[in-house]
Amino acid sequence: MYDRLKGFRDFYPAEMGPRRAAIDAIEDAAASYGFREVGTPAMERTEMYVDKSGAEIVDELYSFTDQGGRDVALTPELTPTVARMVVAKQQALSKPIKWYSSRPFWRYEEPQQGRFREFYQTNLDIFGTSDPRADAEVLAVAADGLTSLGLTGADFEFRVSHRDILGGLLAAFDATVDTEAAIRTVDKREKIERAAYLDDLAAAGLSYDQAEQFDDLLDGDDLDALVSFAGTDRVRDAVANLRNVLDAAETLGVRQYCDVSLTTARGLDYYTGVVFECFDSTGDVGRAVFGGGRYDDLIERFGGQPTPAVGVAPGHATLNLLLENAGVLPDDEFTPDYYVLQVGDTDAEAADVASALRERGNRVDTDITGRSFGAQMNYADNVGADTVVIVGEQDLADGNVTIKNMASGEQTTAPIAAFPGAHDAPRVEDFA
């Protein structure tokens, strides 16, 4: 007997229904805003992540040397891949480029609630515009996807920040600070003890007094006070940009979900401007449902022309936890609309009935094992078929089939020549 690998999951039909409903909701929201689907490889050259993603990702790579001697890795995230794709056809692609993709990723990390070594995300990216409306639009897609699943503003919140506010505040201190290290420390602020948090800020170059002052600034909600403290155009412009994004979110009807949270930093090194994370409002999920932000320099770092970009990536493990905690996890297990039951030598007639129902868009199961009448009825009940159509020799001799509603037990006969007839989804009451 072989055991499943730690951090990997099997999804049986009962689990796949809710997962598929959640994925479809996010993808449908993306498509409604004009995003187009792309497909991407499961593996890339390891050096791409070493060069572009930062230490946090590199330490968790599933990487190896392939049979051709190349150092390769299973993709731990999508942004570098789609950046590579944009660079490859940058001149031919119409701007702005709006793409989405749902697929698995892999990171070697310790499994816990909502975190697995193989995990699934729907990535949404916009390339080719720095307009704040693009930032607001990816938030709007995410919000529309969540609310279409039954969530409300009482269930989730978008915590929004700006990398240049953080970097500008750090630069205002009389210290030589490793800005990226300090921002990575801010990103894990809620995950480590305060003493360790201050130690890490000190290791990045701040004194302990400066670290305390910096943290106090992040806890405040007065953006004008931050501009005054820093006294630089960098922070002033970043605050103005953040406000413009929030104004655009208001226009799109999603400002109600957004809270300014300067301790939201995102740990990946390529983020440059506005960043955001979605959290469960109750705190029960315990980690971000998803995150994203602006990465205006990444295309150029891949060798392309300067191209501003922004993206977000809802994670489906944490999203399903959020839906479950809110009591709105979709109950969408796949079940047949019809089971066509055969009695006697009726293969041809049963196949014709099943084909006619399928042509009308129905999900139809049939017997492929030669089971008895009772065994077929038990199977139809077990797989949750709504309606059973019985195609038996005796009924056919009279020119009929029998239709049975599995929930109520009600049944009637219908002329086979008129079934399904004008009915796309024929029911017992249509022929009673």
UniProtKB/Swiss-Prot annotation:
Keyword check for Aminoacyl-tRNA synthetase: yes
One Gene Ontology biological process: histidyl-tRNA aminoacylation
Reactions listed under catalytic activity: tRNA(His) + L-histidine + ATP = L-histidyl-tRNA(His) + AMP + diphosphate + H(+)
Entry keyword set: Aminoacyl-tRNA synthetase, ATP-binding, Cytoplasm, Ligase, Nucleotide-binding, Protein biosynthesis
Subcellular location: Cytoplasm
InterPro entries with a match to the protein in the record: aa-tRNA-synth_II (IPR006195), aa-tRNA-synth_II/BPL/LPL (IPR045864), Anticodon-bd (IPR004154), Anticodon-bd_dom_sf (IPR036621), His-tRNA-ligase (IPR015807), HisRS-like_core (IPR041715), HisRS/HisZ (IPR004516), HisRS_anticodon (IPR033656)
Family: Belongs to the class-II aminoacyl-tRNA synthetase family.
PANTHER family: HISTIDINE--TRNA LIGASE, MITOCHONDRIAL-RELATED, HISTIDYL-TRNA SYNTHETASE
Protein name: Histidine--tRNA ligase
Organism in which the protein naturally occurs: Halobacterium salinarum (strain ATCC 700922 / JCM 11081 / NRC-1) (Halobacterium halobium)
